[in-house]
């Protein structure tokens, strides 16, 4: 309907044009991974909202540079709503995002990521021209890589990767003695640097 799918990886990992079936399957996989990444990272007060706000800000800047002002409005609107929510979500949190919130944030960010892959910034003079795929991965690095790492650790240990556990990076930082605010702040900084 809206042609929201990744049909070309623009040379990243040597992948270019995808067939219609491959594009549909890969896009579905990407959407599920991003949605679950944000759901799984929502284990510390303020973390999912802050990372979502940062990601939506970066996607907003990207879409401004791409001249997609309507998508930029969506990105900055998500950022604004998450920043307003964040005021009440820091420890001790008065409201919680929950699954409903983290799944919606993940869904919106997955659409923004697909848009950046499909129409990303084009630099003709550098290796592969469209940097959209790499930018999307960079903007969502913490939830994506944390989920991947947790799934691999759980599988290696013979555990079901879909069951809850304390293998996430935010749990490791809490176990080191960082509180909720410092854990969230450290991961915000890491996400910004990536």
Identify the meaning behind each predicted range:
Residues 17, 29, 36, 161-169:
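Juxtamembrane loop-helix boundary motifs flanking transmembrane segments in multi-pass membrane proteins
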Residues 8-18, 178-179:
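Membrane interface segments of multi-pass transport proteins and intramembrane proteases
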Residues 36-39, 89:
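Asparagine-centered polar/low-complexity signal
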Residues 2-13, 117-120:
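Transmembrane alpha-helix boundary signature
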Residues 2-5, 26-36, 52-58, 79:
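Membrane-embedded alpha-helical core segments of multi-pass
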Residues 48-194:
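Alpha-helical transmembrane segments
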Residues 14-28, 67-80:
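Structural signature of hydrophobic alpha-helical transmembrane segments
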């Amino acid at each position: 309907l809206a042609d929201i799918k990744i049909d070309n990886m623009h040379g990243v990992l040597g992948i270019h044009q995808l067939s219609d079936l491959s594009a549909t399957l890969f896009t579905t996989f990407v959407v599920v991974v991003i949605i679950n990444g944000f759901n799984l990272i929502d284990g510390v007060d303020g973390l999912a909202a802050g990372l979502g706000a940062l990601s939506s800000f970066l996607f907003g800047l990207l879409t401004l540079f791409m001249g997609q002002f309507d998508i930029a409005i969506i990105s900055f609107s998500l950022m604004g709503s998450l920043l307003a929510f964040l005021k009440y979500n820091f420890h001790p949190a008065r409201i919680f995002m929950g699954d409903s919130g983290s799944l919606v944030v993940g869904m919106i960010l997955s659409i923004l990521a697909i848009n950046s892959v499909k129409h990303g910034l084009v630099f003709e003079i550098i290796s592969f021209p469209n940097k959209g795929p790499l930018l999307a991965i960079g903007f969502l690095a913490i939830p994506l890589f944390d989920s991947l790492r947790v799934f691999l650790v759980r599988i290696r240990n013979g555990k079901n990767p879909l069951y809850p556990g304390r293998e996430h990076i935010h749990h490791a930082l809490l176990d080191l003695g960082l509180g909720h605010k410092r854990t969230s702040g450290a991961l915000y900084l890491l996400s910004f640097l990536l």
